[in-house]
């Protein structure tokens, strides 16, 4: 919670991993057998926040978690964990290879897709600051405040916040 005023010029909206693999039919989460209605629940609020951010000139940043097609940036323990739950990263699924850059499941869902001029960062890990230029983008744009939204709150959003 923040009790002060928000200066749009110094605030960025960071939309974390709203990807088909996490909240779309045939994606990674759907393939694991989870109810994607739960992962999609935050989309309407995020769409409204995006509309507000765009209208006020706030910097909008989107992230996508994914790995190179040859999986050379996929740590062994991450691959092992995904295989244990039956949806190994890189394996074929209804939305293409799971969490692989360039595949349909890696794309951001249409409801909150980036528009031209918005920052789009690709990351191989959970946090948006790991192996990306997010810090540089924030500093270059004079950003002092962040509004975070995304999927999965307990993993990627929380890791970015920390």
Feature roles, as predicted:
Residues 140, 161-162:
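Active-site-adjacent alpha-helix immediately C-terminal to a catalytic or transition-state-stabilizing loop
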Residues 68, 128, 153:
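Positions that flank functional sites
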Residues 1-115:
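Active-site acidic carboxylates
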């Amino acid at each position: 919670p923040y009790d002060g005023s928000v200066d749009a010029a110094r605030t960025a909206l960071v939309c974390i991993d709203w990807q088909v693999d996490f909240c779309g039919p045939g994606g990674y989460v759907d393939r694991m057998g989870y109810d994607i209605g739960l992962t999609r629940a935050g989309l309407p609020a995020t769409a409204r926040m995006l509309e507000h951010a765009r209208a006020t000139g706030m910097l909008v940043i989107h992230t996508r978690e994914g790995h190179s097609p040859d999986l050379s940036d996929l740590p062994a323990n991450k691959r092992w964990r995904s295989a244990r739950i039956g949806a190994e990263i890189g394996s074929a699924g209804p939305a293409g290879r799971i969490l692989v850059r360039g595949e349909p499941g890696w794309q951001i869902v249409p409801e909150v897709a980036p528009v031209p001029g918005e920052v789009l960062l690709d990351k191989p890990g959970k946090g948006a600051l790991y192996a990306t230029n997010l810090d540089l983008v924030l500093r270059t744009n004079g950003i002092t405040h962040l509004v975070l939204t995304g999927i999965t709150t307990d993993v990627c959003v929380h890791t970015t916040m920390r």
